[in-house]
UniProtKB/Swiss-Prot annotation:
Enzyme class: ligase
Signal sequence, renumbered to the chain: none
Gene3D superfamilies: Bira Bifunctional Protein, Domain 2
InterPro entries in UniProt: Aa-tRNA-synt_II, aa-tRNA-synth_II, aa-tRNA-synth_II/BPL/LPL, EpmA, Lys-tRNA-synth_II_C
Family assignment from sequence similarity: Belongs to the class-II aminoacyl-tRNA synthetase family. EpmA subfamily.
Purpose: With EpmB is involved in the beta-lysylation step of the post-translational modification of translation elongation factor P (EF-P). Catalyzes the ATP-dependent activation of (R)-beta-lysine produced by EpmB, forming a lysyl-adenylate, from which the beta-lysyl moiety is then transferred to the epsilon-amino group of a conserved specific lysine residue in EF-P.
Reaction(s) the record says it catalyses: D-beta-lysine + L-lysyl-[protein] + ATP = N(6)-((3R)-3,6-diaminohexanoyl)-L-lysyl-[protein] + AMP + diphosphate + H(+)
Organism per entry: Histophilus somni (strain 2336)
Protein name as it appears in the record: Elongation factor P--(R)-beta-lysine ligase
EC numbers: 6.3.2.-
Record note on quaternary structure: Homodimer.
Positions of substrate binding: S76, P77, E78, Y118, E249
UniProt xrefs under HAMAP family: EF_P_modif_A
Keywords linked to the UniProt accession: ATP-binding, Ligase, Nucleotide-binding
Amino acid sequence: MSLNEQWQPSASIQNLLARAKIIADIRRFFTERGLLEVETPVLSEFGVTDVHLSTFSTAFTSPFMEKSKTLWLTTSPEYHMKRLLAAGSGAIFQLCKVFRNEESGKKHNPEFTMLEWYRPHFDMHRLINEVDDLLQQTLDCEPAEMASYQFVFQEHVGIDPLSAPINELIEKARECHLDGAENEDRDTLLQFLFSTLVEPNIGQNKPIAVYHFPATQAALAQISSEDHRVAERFEFYYKGIELANGFNELTDAQEQEHRFNQDNRLREQLGLPQHEIDHRFLGALQAGLPNTAGVALGVDRLIMLALGAENISEVISFNIDCA
């Protein structure tokens, strides 16, 4: 392709018009329900410790600074939004750009649009119902199916993910051609088997909310008080696409700091850079985060489904290859 051809957008104008309408409808959905729209920083002093996320960094320089300061492009507005919740914002939502220094492809672009919202005093199941309402409105689809992680894993893998010995997971992963399966930890094996055998086979005719992920995959979610083997975490899938990831949010600052430190220890073991813990976020938890359920949803993927697009580049004005 010549330089003269590279100026054109990756999406058609028709798709961009449809995108604008969908985003306007999303805003209306939340404002009519009384949520406050907020804006939070795209640049942060802190990266994220999650071993599954890679971040972009930049250098902030000024004539009045002795040396430059590293800043990170946010992978999610989560920490800043929770600081607003701790300050008394009430229910909030945000549509924003986020950045992940990872793959680009049919379903991925390093810069993408995230919808994130938080509902104080909601539990996980009540928030699942609200996500379902949004999907029905946006995609004109049937109501979502609800199923536990344990149920769908047993149905499609034939193994109980919460009690099976690791050798059984290794054997199944080998059957699915995972090289070096014997060297992987339990969570990596579970994630591989879930993405290989479960995700392609669920939510084909209508969305599905999978809830109660293993406690070891809790991230920033609470552990279930009824079954300590699982976390109060859910994900939505539809037609082979992971759409949303939500939690009953962890409010214990000490436990959150412990998880951050665990992440950094694992990063060190994997040869990944460690990240300074966001002490401002921990300060918000210490000050008091209300009991809250929150969820992040990939807007570009939602629009792909709404328009029947095969590639994320069809629904964003300029993908990474022509940005």
